[in-house]
């Protein structure tokens, strides 16, 4: 049985009892992407997020060295409460780890970025099928040919997540998710993936491929993995992010993020 509260979920991650993708867990609460980098680069990264708000909507920013972000949860620990972390050295993914306690530095600044998993509970309540949840897979994510707006050393390409839907469901999904810009808002594209520079939906760059049934169209949202393309391009000596699909569970309710 899934933990009922975000705090219980984080505790299960902290104990090592949960290490998988977080889609479908703690439905009424927001999940967050994570980027962690040295303070020397934090101002430029903040400007990068502000320049690319669709992909990088900020939910919280920590002080240098702080591994708690009270705005996200009272008992939250950035170092231990994500099921899996990506470690980048000089722009290359060098390892995945379950904890940052051994890597944490006094100059690290943590950025929490809204995640589209947050609005999936509302889509499901409207009867909109979420194929990756149905199939027990991670959501598929793709690099696009769309460049991000640059800020300092940070650039890279937009990453999108994809959910296949029937046309009527896609329209309803636009209506629902447009209320939540803090977790990526409305889709950026419906239909032909080639218009985004995606050649093969069966070969996602991150996550897992899912079944697209006859009569369905792919629906694409800006994705919080986008900052990882910026971190790779920037080639920082050390930077850390969540492993795609493995999010930080927050105490923020999805309802509180609605703008209308």
From Swiss-Prot:
Entry GO MF terms: lyase activity
EC number: 4.2.1.-
Database matches in InterPro entries: D-Glu_cyclase (IPR009906), Putative_hydro-lyase (IPR038021), UPF0317 (IPR016938)
The keyword Lyase appears for this protein: yes
EC class (word): lyase
Domain of life: Bacteria
Keywords for the protein's UniProt record, in alphabetical order: Lyase
HAMAP family the record matches: Hydro_lyase
UniProt record similarity statement: Belongs to the D-glutamate cyclase family.
Protein name: Putative hydro-lyase Bmul_5125/BMULJ_03391
Provenance organism: Burkholderia multivorans (strain ATCC 17616 / 249)
